[in-house]
UniProtKB/Swiss-Prot annotation:
This is Ribosome-recycling factor. The gene is frr. NCBIfam families: frr. InterPro entries: Ribosome_recyc_fac, Ribosome_recyc_fac_dom, RRF_sf. Pfam families: RRF. One of its GO terms (molecular function) is ribosomal large subunit binding.
Amino acid sequence: MVDVKTIIEESQEKMDMAVMYLEEALAHIRAGKASTRLLDGIRVDSYGSMVPISNVAAVTTPDARSITIKPWDKSMFRVIEKAIIDSDLGIMPENNGEIIRIGIPPLTEERRKQLAKQCKAEGETAKVSIRNARRDGIDALKKAVKDGLAEDEQKNAEAKLQKVHDKYIAKIEEMLAEKDKEIMTV
């Protein structure tokens, strides 16, 4: 016989994954202040394999408006600089031979709106994933009824699943509101 608790836990795991995905996606959307996580998505070629910049250099934020990158291998300066220029972050690195400095310019009103829109799109993707997890859970419960699960147990489990769903949707809304506030703050 199918365990209702397992079905709910599996759905909850899928919902957790959607929230973790959103956290990661929102971390890469710049909000006007310097953050080392801004560069996490940029990969560079290091001895034949693509690795994050943080694997080949020390990445720090000396102040709220700049990021410094100090490559451990001098040959990586050009590679890192090119990768940053080629990224869609809209930032220009300055290479002085010792460190690469990235000035984070203040965001324009238009760019802030674009970023807020991008956040909403990422949030919508996460919400769809959560709804799909709920749907999969409900489908598994309906199948369990055919395998001998009592209908009132199914209804109770669906109600629990809906509560879990609502909790995750609220968490996503909260994350989006926080990021939107961060982006729109001048």
